[in-house]
Amino acid sequence: YGMTEADFLSAELCCVPAFNACDIGFDRSFVGAYGHDDRVCSYPAYTALFEEASEEHTTMVVLADKEEIGSEGSTGMQCAIFTDLIDALAASFGAIGAEVRAHSKCLSADVNAGFDPNFKDVCEPLNSTFLSCGAGYAFTYPSPTGSRGKGGSNDASAEFVGEIRKLFNENGVVWQTGELGKVDVGGGGTVAKFIAKMNIDTVDIGVPVISMHSP
């Protein structure tokens, strides 16, 4: 390939499993795949964007990187490119970026930790999301994300959560709510808190998965 040892000093290399996605379970009810947590969120996000026929509102999808290390760097959700982009779009219409963000709504797509009977000690059974909870897709919007007493979480407003709940019910979306692991035992974070910091109403949404970071 014409590479030398020096090229590895600036190379960005990724080692990933080579096997294809497959059905898992006695009834083939589960999907097993590398990177399933990212793909199950990003694919419906951009297909919904492409299929949106209404021109009443401006819609966008942001696919960010580095979430597992705190959304740092120029490709993470803490980068200013998102606010810069909104400011540029607002300026083209003679609007103010801060006002546009205040009137914006965001669904932060990320998977939730589904209840796993093999590791049930880190979950709260009465406040967890479950796989195969009914027909269609099982969406969650866990407000109590975060860890260590739910520090670092995003607390969506009751009004916005109610708006999303009404939207789901009117469109036949199967949904459930649940926390991201038992308080002070399980836990995790999403990029929702960074978007909410921009004064954008934000709520987490995503399918529950198990074995989230396994190969």
Regions found by a protein language model. Name each.
Residues 2-12, 55-61, 94-103, 168-182:
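Flexible, glycine/charged-enriched surface loops at secondary-structure junctions
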Residues 28-30, 50, 56, 60, ...:
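Class II aminoacyl-tRNA synthetase catalytic cores and aaRS-like
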Residues 43-131, 136, 186-187:
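Acidic/histidine-rich catalytic neighborhood of metal-dependent amide-processing enzymes
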